[in-house]
Structures are given as structure tokens and as C-alpha cells.
Amino acid sequence: MDWDLVGILTRSSKVYTLSYDSKILSGIFEILCEPIIRTICENKNWELEKGVQNQYPEFTIYSKKSPNKKIAVDIKSTYRQRNVNGELKSFAFTLGSYRSYLQDVKGEKGILYPYKQYIEHWIIGFIYDRNPNCRITDIKAIIDASRLEPPYSNIEYFIQQKYKIAGTSKGSGNTTNIGSIKSNDLNDFRTGKGPFNTKEEFELYWKNYK
């Protein structure tokens, strides 16, 4: 995978450089993942649908033979932070709202298809270092593209089912988002060291979370 995105190209051959703003980079990771997911689906003869903004999930996968057995895929990302001693702090991800489709009686709020049609929910998660040289967006000529720096480095990722990495507390800040486990070891996410043993256990907890 070529992670070295450095900007957005216009028809007039100008490059708008990328800042390390987390909202921008979350969209970038989704863009990078989409062709890979699409290729997998084409090879398996699966259908792939994208959700709209603020709708769960980002990608819905299913077979025409079993349209009521859908797979949800969401892309999540965060950046590394270190303490004064240079040690990596624990990190976490937000895993979508618990007040929409999970707590909706019909399971149809804020979701592409009714929640009951999804048999699996997967997270592709990324963690990266922010490039301090990419704090702001600038405009450069296309001839300078090879000298531009990407806004991130040291990218690592995991792929895991949501219930296996979900925690028991909401995401940070004034949100209604499910919070993941917290760890400074990405292998805890890769191996799914969350507190829930089954998807049903996870759903029961968050359907009743206040």
C-alpha cells in the first residue's frame, strides 16, 4: 500500500498540501481503503455499498444470494501521543453512536440498512505519527510534489470485529459514541482483548447504556 499522499491535485496543476488535522486524515484512510475493499468484493462476487456522511457503516458488504446477511466495515484512525519521557500513551478509538441504531427500537436510525440485517461488524483501525511540518495547508506547484511530505508516518493498522475491541465507557468528550478499549499496544486491538465475549453481550450492554 502506498501511504505517501501529499496533497490534492486541481485541474490547474496546483497541489493543496495535506495538514495533519485528524478529520482530514480519517477521510484519507477511508479513500485509501476503498479500492482494496472494492477489489476484494469484486473477486468474491460480493455487493459493496457506501454509506452517506454521518451514516453507519462506511461500507456494507453482502452476497446477492444472502442479502439479509450483511457485513459492516468502518474505518477508524488516531495518532500517537507520548508523555514527557517519550513513552507512548494509551490510545483508543470511537466506534460509532450507541444512541442511534443500537438503542432505536426498529434499529433503523442512522444506519444504511436495519441493524438486524448485519451479522458482522468489522473495524479497520489505523494509528500514525503526525508530521509536525504539516500543521497547515499550503498551495504548491505540481512540479514540487515529489518534495512534499505526507502529513503522517509510521502507519500501523489492525482489522478486528467491533465487539472484540469495544470498551465499557463512551468515547472521550461530550459524545454518544461507543469507546474502544485503551492500550498503548496495538496487538491488544489486533487480538481483540476487549471485555465482551460475544457480539450479543456487547449489544445488550450498549443498547442499555445511559
Give the role of each language-model region:
Residues 60, 76:
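Anionic group-transfer/hydrolysis microenvironments
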